[in-house]
């Protein structure tokens, strides 16, 4: 089994020792139904956040020319990112990729932001979702959920780190800790005859 060695220096500083929250499968279904009812630009940006794991600010600053089709995969080119984490990443979720590409294809390519929406407005929609549904939610929770879902699918932690634009592998590990990992392949099978009490 391949392993990734994380040294103590890789772990993020000043992070409280508590488990990172992520959206449950039920909450994700509610979230998807909710954003499908938003206006096209808001709908597309939230699908992008869910399907790519990018930061809110990164999504808000994308131009139409930053979204490209490579083969049958949709990629976003993130520039001037936090901590110098510029990167070109795919939209992992198929439905998200189709929605974002359709939205982008219907727009005229110019120098304006792709979604014509500010970071503050996106966060405002997130607040409305939380108030309407009663689900504890903020935009960054989508990055946590993205990391957890990829980890559950067996994507290497170093790949998740690149997709999220993390400087530290330890930060990625912190995000991915809410993954529901199936440990059954690694569990020993005991011989019940050796442990059952005698009659």
Task: Give the label of every model feature segment.
Residues 23-56:
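Basic, Lys/Arg- and aromatic-enriched nucleic-acid-binding interface segment
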Residues 58-59, 137, 147, 154-168, ...:
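Active-site-proximal segment of tyrosine recombinases
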Residues 1-11, 19, 190-199:
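C-terminal secondary-structure termini that scaffold catalytic or DNA-interacting sites
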Residues 28, 92-136:
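Active-site/catalytic core of tyrosine-dependent DNA strand-transfer enzymes
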Residues 6-29, 83-94, 109-110:
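DNA breakage-rejoining catalytic core of tyrosine-based enzymes
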Residues 49-72, 158:
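Short, charged phosphate-coordinating catalytic segments
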Residues 164, 169-189:
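Catalytic-site neighborhood detector that most strongly recognizes the C-terminal catalytic loop/helix
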Residues 61-99:
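Conserved tyrosine-mediated DNA breakage-rejoining catalytic core shared by Y-recombinases
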């Amino acid at each position: 089994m391949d392993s990734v060695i994380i040294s103590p220096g890789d772990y993020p500083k000043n992070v409280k020792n508590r488990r990172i929250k992520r959206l449950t499968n039920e909450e994700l279904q509610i979230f998807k139904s909710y954003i499908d009812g938003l206006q096209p630009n808001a709908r597309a940006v939230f699908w992008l956040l869910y399907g790519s794991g990018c930061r809110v600010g990164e999504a808000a600053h994308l131009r139409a020319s930053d979204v490209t089709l490579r083969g049958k995969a949709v990629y976003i080119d993130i520039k001037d990112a936090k901590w110098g984490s510029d990167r070109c990443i795919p939209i992992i979720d198929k439905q998200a990729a189709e929605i974002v590409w359709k939205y982008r294809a219907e727009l005229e390519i110019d120098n304006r932001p792709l979604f014509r929406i500010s970071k503050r407005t996106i966060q405002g929609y997130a607040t409305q979702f939380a108030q309407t549904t009663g689900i504890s939610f903020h935009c960054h929770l989508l990055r946590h959920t993205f990391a957890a879902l990829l980890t559950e699918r067996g994507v290497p932690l170093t790949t998740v780190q690149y997709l999220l634009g993390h400087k530290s592998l330890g930060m990625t590990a912190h995000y991915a800790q809410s993954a529901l990992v199936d440990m059954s392949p690694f569990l020993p099978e005991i011989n019940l005859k050796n442990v059952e009490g005698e009659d």
